[in-house]
Curated annotation (Swiss-Prot):
One of its GO terms (cellular component) is vacuolar membrane. It is a multi-pass membrane protein. Vacuolar effluxer which mediate the efflux of amino acids resulting from autophagic degradation. The release of autophagic amino acids allows the maintenance of protein synthesis and viability during nitrogen starvation. Belongs to the ATG22 family. InterPro entries: Atg22, Atg22-like, ATG22/LtaA_families, MFS_trans_sf. The keyword tRNA-binding does not apply. Keywords: Amino-acid transport, Autophagy, Glycoprotein, Membrane, Transmembrane, Transmembrane helix, Transport, Vacuole. The keyword Ligase does not apply. It comes from Pichia angusta (Yeast). It is found in: Vacuole membrane. The chain crosses the membrane at residues 32-52, 126-146, 156-176, 181-201, 239-259, 277-297, 358-378, 393-413, 425-445, 453-473, 493-513, 523-543. CDD domains: MFS_Atg22_like (cd17483). This is Autophagy-related protein 22. PANTHER family: AUTOPHAGY-RELATED PROTEIN 22.
Length: 559
């Protein structure tokens, strides 16, 4: 969450108080460098760890501990014990209302959970893990958003979450072939830490812009100041985004080379060792580059949240207990403020039909695009038998294509074809929907439709281009529909929608895999989701109407 670049709230707002030393120092080049460093440090985690290696590790470690679905006794990755009889093939009717053949039953692998109380498909284990991690991350993001936007906590929280996330990711070095619960828990904790870093990092942008020397020196013209702020904001934000992209691409190449080196070592036969090695390296990268932020960024005070209780007197008895109680009350007040901010955003958005339509469409798109990545990675490993090196190469191609999409779509394709933002957004949705549609084609054609590894390379380029394009166009379209002066609260809602949507897709895909033990069937769900977003944008959003409604709402609130 970020504050509005111009704070329109009055200083005598009852729930907020200004600290006495609210005067801010000028933004320096070193501070901008320090802010960009948070993206340089953390972006490889989301691209390499979450996007590539952790899904592979979780699937592999689940398979190493899994058993055959047909008897739930035979280990998946070990030869069958001759003393244990193999069950006879099932007769017709043994699996009523099931789409499974005997062959798919025999090949499928399931993981016993909590002492064998129930079983899940080994491919769905990673999806359930990420669904849970996003749920925890969303709760954390809402709870801490009040502290990230208020007071002097954002710097310490940014560094703290980054260091914690790096250390947790490095703990993958301790995971062995049996620790599938530990591997899953580390993914949940590290992804939650990344969410905290992202919130705190975003909250710095408006402060860096407001206190930039070229902005502070403008006193007479508000319009000129706003224009300069927009220019500086785009410049700083662009540098930060570029540093994250470059860092992620660089780290993806480094980890791929490490895996190549380890694979050629005849003394290493563990399938998860190279995966946990490169995951830990990304954690080390995150940890090392997070530390300089402590010295480069200034605390940047902002309005403190007022707590209607005085701090305890150190001279009175029971001070240690009272100070703990006081700090808990302060933490609770900040958490409550975060949820109040979210409800305020939802209440304001409910008055704007175009904002509501956008958020509904964005919920579907964000969920689908996120789930396509993890589903495709698991499909490539389990069905196409692609190696970790090949999947690393796909990650590199996706990253390069995403950069190209983010540049070419708004700067070349959109102006050349004279497309509006809504039309461009719909074009991207249709473009992305061809990915699961191509996977569905494999049900009917053996020569096409993701039956060969080379097809994954082509789809990686296709997917990356849509990913880079949608990231650029979505924010531009959404920003046009927001009432001026309420950017912070509405982008908070955008962020929560973005994060929260990623709970649904992986969970539903995991259920489909558990029911059918066929990842390809998940492409039907992803295709339907993406196509469902088209009418939401086509019929639900009128950009001119949205701008007018936002302006009217702004005037009503000012009045």
């Amino acid at each position: 969450m970020t504050e509005p670049l111009l704070d329109s709230s009055s200083d005598d707002e009852p729930s907020l108080v200004l600290p006495e030393n609210i005067n801010q120092p000028f933004t320096t080049g070193a501070e901008v460098f320090g802010w960009c460093l948070y993206s340089w440090a953390a972006e490889p985690f989301i691209v390499s760890v979450v996007g590539t290696y952790v899904p592979l590790l979780l699937e592999q470690i689940a398979r190493d501990n899994g058993v055959k679905l047909i008897d739930k006794i035979t280990p998946c990755n070990q030869p069958h014990d001759p003393t244990i009889p193999i069950p006879s093939p099932p007769k017709d009717g043994d699996f009523p209302n099931s789409t499974l053949t005997y062959a798919s039953q025999n090949d499928s692998c399931v993981l016993p959970m909590f002492g064998g109380r129930f079983y899940i498909d080994t491919s769905s284990y990673a999806l359930y893990t990420f669904s849970m991690s996003v749920l925890i991350q969303t709760i954390l993001v809402i709870s801490m958003s009040g502290a990230a936007d208020r007071g002097s906590h954002r710097k310490s929280m940014l560094v703290g979450f980054g260091v914690t996330g790096g250390l947790i990711t490095m703990c993958y070095w301790l995971v062995d072939d049996r620790n599938y619960y530990m591997a899953s828990m580390l993914a949940i904790l590290a992804n939650s830490a990344f969410g905290g870093v992202n919130v705190c990092g975003n909250s710095f942008l408006s402060l860096l812009v407001n206190n930039h020397p070229s902005v502070r020196q403008i006193h007479l013209s508000k319009s000129l100041k706003l224009a300069r702020m927009g220019e500086i904001s785009s410049k700083i934000s662009g540098i930060c985004a570029a540093s994250g992209y470059i860092s992620a691409l660089l780290m993806q190449i480094i980890t791929m080379l490490v895996i190549l080196h380890v694979r050629n070592n005849p003394n290493i036969d563990s399938l998860i060792y190279p995966l946990k090695l490169v995951i830990g390296l990304v954690g080390l990268w995150w940890f090392v580059f997070q530390l300089p932020i402590q010295f480069l960024l200034k605390p940047r005070l902002s309005k403190e949240l007022h707590v209607s209780i005085e701090p305890p007197d150190p001279s009175k008895p029971g001070y240690s207990v009272n100070i703990v109680r006081y700090k808990m009350l302060v933490v609770g007040a900040y958490i409550l403020h975060g949820y109040k901010t979210l409800f305020s955003a939802a209440r304001a958005a409910s008055q704007l039909k175009d904002i509501m339509a956008f958020l509904l469409g964005w919920f579907i798109i964000s969920d689908s695009l996120t789930t396509i990545n993890s589903t495709a990675i698991l499909f490539a490993k389990s069905d196409l038998q692609m190696t970790t090196v090949q999947l690393s190469q796909i990650g590199v191609l996706t990253m390069i294509s995403a950069i190209a999409g983010s540049v070419l779509l708004p700067n070349v394709i959109q102006p050349y074809f004279k497309l509006g933002l809504k039309q461009t957004m719909i074009l991207i949705i249709v473009w992305a929907s061809l990915i699961p549609l191509y996977g569905i084609l494999g049900f009917f054609i053996r020569s096409l439709g993701l039956h060969h590894a080379v097809e994954m390379y082509v789809l990686a380029i296709w997917y990356g281009f849509s990913l880079g394009g949608v990231a650029t166009i979505s924010r531009s379209l959404y920003s046009m529909l927001i009432p001026p002066g309420q950017e912070s609260v509405f982008f908070a809602l955008f962020s929560i929608t973005d994060k929260g949507s990623s709970i649904v897709g992986p969970f539903l895909v995991g259920l489909i895999i558990d029911k059918t033990h066929d990842i390809r069937k998940c492409f039907w769900l992803l295709f339907v989701f993406l196509i469902a977003a088209v009418p939401v944008f086509w019929y639900g959003i009128d950009v001119d109407r949205g701008i007018n409604e936002a302006t009217v709402l702004e005037h009503e609130q000012d009045g």
